[in-house]
């Protein structure tokens, strides 16, 4: 039976959401090719919609890793969503992203594992964080 790696991306910018999702997919492709794992990648550009689906139990909240923008629009920030995620997926890797470096200092009450500044390297960096987390959690090498 295949182990499932569940990844959540919440980024309100559709272009960046796609770039991040693609980088994450590419980062785990070597492991998926070995056949023992499968990836379930859920992506949202609207955090309110995600919260509604979790609260209505339309979606489960049992992620291996979460990549989330700090500013989500509609008065929401990553802290609101991470709190909900941690209730259900306590050991999930949480990578918070923002264009503003100062967000890291502002968000010291938000439980995240890594903070990534959104630049041209951020999607690849997120992919590397996921690779490292999977290698450690499942004792598997992602080397090609």
Predicted feature residues:
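Conserved acidic segment of CheY-like receiver
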Residues: 4-25
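Conserved sequence signature across two-component system core domains
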Residues: 10-11, 44, 66
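A generic structural motif
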Residues: 28-42, 61, 92
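Helix N-cap/capping motif at the beta->alpha junctions
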Residues: 29, 43-52, 77-78
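Conserved phosphotransfer microenvironments
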Residues: 47, 57-85
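Two-component signal transduction core modules
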Residues: 66, 94, 115-116
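Alpha4 helix (beta4-alpha4-beta5 surface) of REC/receiver domains from two-component response regulators
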Residues: 76, 80, 98-120, 124-128
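Receiver (REC) domain switch/output surface
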Residues: 109, 125-144
């Amino acid at each position: 039976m295949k182990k499932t790696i569940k990844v959540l991306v919440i980024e309100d910018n559709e272009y960046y959401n796609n770039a991040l999702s693609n980088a994450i997919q590419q980062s785990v492709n070597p492991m998926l090719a070995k056949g023992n794992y499968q990836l379930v990648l859920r992506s949202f550009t609207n955090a309110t919609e995600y919260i509604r689906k979790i609260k209505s139990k339309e979606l489960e909240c049992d992620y291996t890793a979460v990549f989330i923008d700090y500013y989500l629009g509609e008065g929401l920030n990553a802290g609101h969503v991470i709190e909900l995620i941690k209730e259900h997926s306590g050991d999930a890797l949480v990578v918070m992203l923002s264009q503003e470096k100062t967000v890291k200092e502002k968000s010291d009450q938000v439980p995240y594992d890594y903070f990534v500044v959104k630049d041209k390297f951020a999607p690849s960096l997120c992919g590397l964080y996921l690779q490292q987390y999977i290698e450690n959690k499942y004792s598997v090498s992602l080397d090609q």
